[in-house]
């Protein structure tokens, strides 16, 4: 009986159509169970595997981790701004600024305000980031040198900067004939008015050339044979022309009416230099005396200055009218006050360093106490003086006779005219006195220089009987328009009356 029971059990085991008790669960059952419920204990699975004598389905002692899935709800952003570095005040200012009307400040004022804000805040408010994702970099240690230091300059550098040097034409813009001009170093034969009219003395006549229209007019001609014109000078307003003659006369002409207003005779020798200071006309003669004429009154001769022993060939009032500079054939430069002192008319300064006749005298237009003088053939020097202290600021050997000096009102430069051997015009940089350019073309010595009212053109009269116009101080068009708008017309004091 027991044999039949054993066979029945063996047959049921070999059929394999029933689940095996205590056997490991199938893989598909395990996967389904893991998806719906907690995973089975690792120890229990390991025990079942070893009890059955089969290879385990997973590493013993290692838990079966759950598969990572994308969360259904969004989490926080990793890019969180730092509250300490956030420009919350700037954000509030910019939001409130949108509702405010724009002020009518000038572009220059806005640029200054922008530069101040950049220096104070360390950044541009208009372009500042409100939220910062990281802190500012640390400053460089003290004394650290960086080759790119220019990138961290306090001052904003423009994207494009204009070249420091400018173009100076080496050829004259125009050449005019000046026949019978007297080849005399001591005379002053050309002057340019504020009305853009050039006066030229040719022997015994005075001609006027209108630079705007090109018209030429003969203003006067001496009546006596042998007499000639020795000097010309326009009043500042440009309506009246003073003419010095070889017969010791000073004539005053109304150019618009082409009429001589008066003839002033107080000198004893030819009048070789003239200079205006409002209604006071100063004249220097071969006798060495300087006379002041008040053209408003009948008794015009109001003062006599005696500071030279030979001919006064250079005479120029300062732009502010406080000082008068005179240069003579006695190699002396005197600086006179505008009025007499306690001891009368005495020079404030007397300079004796020149070794030749001093015809070239010119005042600096932007610094009223600076005077430039040039000596003749025996001296060949240009000297810069401080008339307040009496000090010679600089002296340059130009290796030729100096006939005239002019300052440029647009550039910190001056131009000088020279004689033998090259008869050239030289532009100098102030205060270094470095040579900027040389303008050549005259075949004989330069006698006189004068400047156009806009300060862009220099006219040079030379012994080769030519008058050359050099556009050596041409102004930038944008800057010229600004200065033209800022300039104001002044009424002439001469209209108070000329008798």
Swiss-Prot record:
Q: How is it modified after translation?
A: Phosphorylated during mitosis. Phosphorylated by BUB1 at Ser-41; Ser-72; Ser-92; Ser-153; Thr-157 and Ser-161. Phosphorylated by NEK2.
Residues with Phosphoserine modification: 41, 72, 92, 153, 161
UniProt KW keywords: Acetylation, Cell cycle, Cell division, Centromere, Chromosome, Cytoplasm, Cytoskeleton, Isopeptide bond, Kinetochore, Mitosis, Phosphoprotein, Repeat, Ubl conjugation, Ubl conjugation pathway, WD repeat
One GO term (biological process): positive regulation of ubiquitin protein ligase activity
Alphabetized SMART domains for the sequence: WD40
Record's subunit section: Component of a complex with CDC20, CDC27, SPATC1 and TUBG1. Interacts with NEUROD2. Interacts with dimeric MAD2L1 in its closed conformation form. Interacts with BUB1B. The phosphorylated form interacts with APC/C. Interacts with NINL. May interact with MAD2L2. Interacts with CDK5RAP2. Interacts with SIRT2. Interacts with isoform 1 of NEK2. Interacts with HSF1 (via phosphorylated form); this interaction occurs in mitosis in a MAD2L1-dependent manner and prevents PLK1-stimulated degradation of HSF1 by blocking the recruitment of the SCF(BTRC) ubiquitin ligase complex.
* Name recorded for this polypeptide: Cell division cycle protein 20 homolog
Q: Which organism is it from?
A: Rattus norvegicus
Gene expressing this chain: Cdc20
């Amino acid at each position: 009986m027991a044999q039949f029971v054993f066979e029945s059990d063996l047959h049921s085991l070999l059929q394999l159509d029933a689940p095996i008790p205590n056997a490991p669960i199938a893989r598909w059952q395990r996967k389904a169970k893991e998806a719906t419920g907690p995973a089975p204990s690792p120890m229990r699975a390991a025990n079942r595997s070893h009890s059955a004598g089969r290879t385990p389905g997973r590493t013993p002692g290692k838990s079966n981790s759950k598969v990572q899935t994308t969360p259904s709800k969004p989490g926080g952003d990793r890019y969180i701004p730092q509250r300490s570095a956030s420009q919350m005040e700037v954000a509030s200012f910019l939001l409130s600024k949108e509702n405010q009307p724009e002020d009518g400040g000038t572009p220059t004022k806005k640029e200054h305000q922008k530069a101040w804000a950049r220096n104070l805040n360390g950044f541009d408010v208009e372009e500042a980031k409100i939220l910062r994702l990281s802190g500012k970099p640390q400053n460089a240690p003290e004394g650290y040198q960086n080759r790119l230091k220019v990138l961290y300059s306090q001052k904003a550098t423009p994207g494009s900067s204009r070249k420091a040097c400018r173009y100076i034409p080496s050829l004259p813009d125009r050449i005019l004939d000046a026949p019978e001009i007297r080849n005399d170093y001591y005379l002053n034969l050309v002057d340019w008015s504020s009305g853009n009219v050039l006066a030229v003395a040719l022997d015994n006549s005075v001609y006027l050339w209108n630079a705007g229209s090109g018209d030429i007019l003969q203003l006067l001609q001496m009546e006596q044979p042998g007499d000639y014109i020795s000097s010309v000078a326009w009043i500042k307003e440009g309506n009246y022309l003073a003419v010095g003659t070889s017969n010791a006369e000073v004539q005053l002409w109304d150019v618009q009416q082409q009429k001589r207003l008066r003839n002033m005779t107080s000198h004893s020798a030819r009048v070789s230099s003239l200079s205006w200071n409002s209604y006071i006309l100063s004249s220097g003669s071969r006798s060495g005396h300087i006379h002041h004429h008040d053209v408003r009154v009948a008794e015009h001769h109001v003062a006599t200055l005696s500071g030279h022993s030979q001919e006064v060939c250079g005479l120029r009032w300062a732009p502010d009218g406080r000082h008068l500079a005179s240069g003579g054939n006695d190699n002396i430069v005197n600086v006179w006050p505008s009025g007499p002192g306690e001891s009368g008319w005495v020079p404030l300064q007397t300079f004796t360093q020149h070794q030749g006749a001093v015809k070239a005298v010119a005042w600096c237009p932007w610094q009223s106490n600076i005077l430039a003088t040039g000596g003749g053939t025996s001296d060949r020097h240009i000297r810069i003086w401080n008339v307040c202290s009496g000090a010679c600021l600089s002296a340059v050997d130009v290796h030729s006779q100096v006939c005239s000096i002019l300052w440029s009102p647009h550039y910190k430069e001056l131009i000088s005219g020279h004689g033998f051997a090259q008869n050239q015009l030289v532009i100098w940089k102030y205060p270094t006195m470095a040579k900027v350019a040389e303008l050549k073309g005259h075949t004989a010595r330069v006698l006189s220089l004068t400047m156009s009212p806009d300060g862009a053109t220099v006219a040079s009269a030379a012994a080769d009987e030519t008058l050359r116009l050099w556009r050596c101080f041409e102004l930038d068009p944008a800057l010229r328009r600004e200065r033209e708008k800022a300039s104001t017309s002044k009424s002439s004091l001469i209209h108070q009356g000329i008798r």
